[in-house]
């Protein structure tokens, strides 16, 4: 619920009338709304809490999670992620390269075995200081995660800001 009261959402809704890309996004959301489940938090309590609220909708071994406040206009981002998941049978997290000085705004990944479009994650840090960041690859609100992350989240201690962070649960699964 808090997202709908957010100034950002109101600005996007206003911009939608003028912006062709946003019009397309809202049109697609409307088209798929019977397949998409929106779950609301009454107050911000972290991405982990949001996932726990979705528990009853998660039927498969893995699920695709899209954060509503991260708009990705790149064509087929989720489709590419699903394709990679089908090939690897593993989790997939969308990333973008950010400036080192801005890493404290993001969940940041450490990795190994980098190829052109993918890498194996070996570390996740939620909003690190620039000198503590393992890279400058930031998580951008698209995940394919295993359903077993629910049990990790359920038993997880609260992280930065007193919230339940999905990044902390991912870190546990990596170990």
What is the predicted function of each stretch?
Residues 64, 78, 82-83, 115-175:
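Catalytic-core segments of class I nucleotidyltransferases/pyrophosphorylases
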Residues 12-16, 163-166:
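A short, aromatic/hydrophobic, helix- or strand-capping loop or linear motif
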Residues 1-7:
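Glycine-rich loop at the start of a catalytic domain that most often binds anionic cofactors/ligands
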Residues 4, 48, 72-73, 107-112, ...:
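Generic, ordered loop/turn and secondary-structure boundary motif
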Residues 9-14, 22-111, 154:
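Conserved beta-loop-beta/alpha segment of the NTase-like Rossmann-fold superfamily
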